[in-house]
């Protein structure tokens, strides 16, 4: 496993994979390959042609690393790169009457070394024409770019694209595809957060992780007044190729993406990740180790939520562990899963730079049968908010062999809340802290004699209030240790119930403790299932140190 670090901001999604063999296949498919932007040549395109292109590409050898950039682009700083602006007067759909959407392209440079080709498609005639790079499309401002080095570089390509929505047609984008196969979107706050990817390969194996690239995009010309657009993408990497169709709905309060892909394996793949997403969790109510700042919480997402094929709802709060952790949750035809950011209260973050209270959740809804597999969750130790350390994806049970073909359909919801909710009581928050003392005496006149860790899980909604007179029973399962001092407390401000218990070790082991809890009433489950992974300290650290100076 090669541990990855994802730098946020302009460096967040730098392409790290090799160059594609797309050029020869374009000519085979009779696409315009001429570098002359003024030749006006058009060629037929539709999704079936793209699938054939991806299939044929998989039969050829991957061509490795991208070619070098001109020096003036290769040596750019993030600040210089961010100062380059696309000329809004030359946007993709600038001439569409009553346009509600528009698209601009990202410049090559810095860590963005992979050439991405762009094509405009007339959806009525299915004719496509390539959009070639030229310096006149951009405003270089104070980036310090020597544009003389770019003259005649019509095949330089672009790094990616972003889409804007009225009334912010040139100021605030709502969708962005940039670097490798990364992409992201916003809700009505216009605040970016976590990212998705086209595909993940060998994220947690003994092989180096592979990052496929989107190497070309085809844009259907948007219709007048429309807030939905369609873009097609060709994916390429050493082990696999793919044809993707994104139908993207830029709604008032959310962005919804309908994704269809057709994948063609070049090689055997140890771990194939479908609908992968990448996020950041530094600290939160349950994990305080890295919260020695003025900010009470720092995270893009606070939990993994899963709606299993059997109907069970699971809430798994995220962690920032001291050692890399990978967990796989078995399922059969999952109904949905996602990394959610449900705490939207500014006072819980106190961050006027990151605005974590405004960051969207991302929910995956399979649209065809995915069969058996696992939802994988990787949590990487991180020292702060600039490194993405959370990865989640679906891994099919069937091993991937060279020559295999797959097709997946799913819908992505970028929104403040997921489109579906557990009808039972839901986990609102998880808190941890010192245990071993009666609640209300924290910790009293002296520290507890016996070390313990306290867990408090707040549940809201569902039939909790109706169940209370009949008796609410927490069902707690631990992989090691004991749960004691279990309490059920009504919390009036949230109109919910807190289940509180202390965990006591029964051995010196420092292996992660898997915890599972749900609520039931008269034998029936009345809540979603809470899953947690706790990392106990070494035996010599299981003590309370009174460092008070009394004289």
Swiss-Prot record:
Keywords: Periplasm, Signal
Signal peptide: 1-32
Subcellular location: Periplasm
Superkingdom of source: Bacteria
Principal location listed in the UniProt entry: periplasm
SUPFAM superfamilies, A to Z: E set domains, Galactose mutarotase-like
InterPro entries: Gal_mutarotase_sf_dom, GH-type_carb-bd, Glucan_biosyn_MdoD, Glucan_biosyn_MdoG/MdoD, Glucan_biosyn_MdoG_C, Ig-like_fold, Ig_E-set, TAT_signal
Molecular function as annotated in GO: carbohydrate binding; catalytic activity
GO biological process: beta-glucan biosynthetic process
Gene Ontology cellular component list: outer membrane-bounded periplasmic space
PTM characteristics: Predicted to be exported by the Tat system. The position of the signal peptide cleavage has not been experimentally proven.
Pathway: Glycan metabolism; osmoregulated periplasmic glucan (OPG) biosynthesis
Purpose of the protein: Probably involved in the control of the structural glucose backbone of osmoregulated periplasmic glucans (OPGs).
PANTHER family named in the record: GLUCANS BIOSYNTHESIS PROTEIN, GLUCANS BIOSYNTHESIS PROTEIN D
Family classification: Belongs to the OpgD/OpgG family.
Protein name: Glucans biosynthesis protein D
Biological source species: Escherichia coli O139:H28 (strain E24377A / ETEC)
């Amino acid at each position: 496993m090669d541990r990855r670090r994802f730098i946020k901001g302009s460096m967040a999604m730098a392409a790290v994979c090799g160059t594609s063999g797309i050029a020869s296949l374009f000519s085979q498919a009779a696409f315009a390959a001429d570098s002359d932007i003024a030749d006006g040549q058009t060629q037929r395109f539709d999704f079936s042609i793209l699938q054939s292109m991806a299939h044929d590409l998989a039969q050829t050898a991957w061509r490795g690393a991208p070619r070098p950039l001109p020096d003036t682009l290769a040596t750019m700083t993030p600040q210089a790169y961010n100062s380059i602006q696309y000329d809004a007067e030359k946007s993709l759909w600038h001439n569409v009457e009553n346009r509600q959407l528009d698209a601009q392209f990202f410049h090559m440079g810095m860590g963005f070394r992979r050439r991405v080709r762009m094509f405009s498609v007339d959806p009525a005639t299915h004719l496509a024409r390539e959009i070639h790079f030229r310096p006149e499309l951009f405003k270089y401002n104070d980036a310090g770019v020597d544009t003389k080095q770019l003259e005649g570089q019509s095949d330089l390509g672009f790094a990616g694209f972003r889409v804007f929505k009225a009334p912010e047609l040139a100021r605030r984008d709502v969708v962005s595809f940039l670097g490798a196969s990364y992409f992201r979107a916003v809700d009505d706050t216009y605040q970016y957060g976590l990212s998705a990817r086209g595909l993940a390969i060998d994220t947690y194996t003994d092989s180096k992780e592979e990052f496929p690239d989107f190497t070309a995009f085809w844009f259907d010309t948007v219709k007048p007044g429309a807030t939905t657009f369609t873009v097609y993408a060709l994916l390429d990497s050493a082990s696999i190729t793919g044809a993707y169709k994104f139908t993207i709905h830029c709604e008032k309060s959310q962005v919804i993406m309908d994704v269809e892909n057709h994948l063609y394996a070049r090689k055997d793949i140890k771990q194939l990740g479908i609908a992968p997403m990448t996020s950041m969790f530094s600290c939160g109510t349950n994990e305080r180790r890295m919260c020695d700042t003025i900010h009470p919480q720092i995270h893009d997402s606070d939990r993994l939520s899963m709606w299993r094929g059997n109907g069970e709802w699971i809430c798994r709060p995220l962690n920032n562990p001291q050692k890399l952790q990978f967990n796989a949750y078995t399922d059969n035809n999952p109904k949905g899963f996602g990394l959610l950011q449900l705490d939207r209260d500014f006072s819980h973050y106190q961050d006027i730079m990151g605005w974590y209270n405004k960051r969207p959740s991302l929910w995956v809804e399979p649209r065809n049968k995915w069969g058996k597999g696992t939802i994988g969750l990787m949590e990487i130790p991180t020292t702060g908010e600039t490194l993405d350390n959370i990865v989640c994806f679906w891994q099919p049970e069937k091993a991937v062999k060279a020559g295999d073909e797959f097709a997946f359909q799913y819908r992505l919801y970028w929104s403040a809340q997921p489109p579906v909710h557990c009808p039972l009581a839901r986990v609102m928050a998880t808190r941890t802290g010192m245990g071993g003392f009666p609640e209300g005496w924290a910790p009293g006149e002296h520290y507890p004699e016996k070390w313990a860790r306290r867990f408090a899980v707040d549940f809201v909604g569902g039939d909790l209030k109706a169940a209370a007179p009949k008796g609410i029973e927490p069902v707690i399962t631990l992989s090691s240790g004991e749960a004691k001092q279990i309490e059920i407390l009504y919390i009036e401000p949230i109109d919910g119930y807190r289940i509180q218990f202390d965990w006591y070790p029964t051995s010196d082991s420092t292996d992660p403790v898997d915890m599972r809890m749900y609520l039931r009433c008269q034998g029936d489950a009345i809540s979603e299932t809470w899953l947690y992974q706790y990392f106990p300290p070494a035996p010599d650290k299981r003590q309370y140190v009174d460092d008070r100076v009394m004289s």
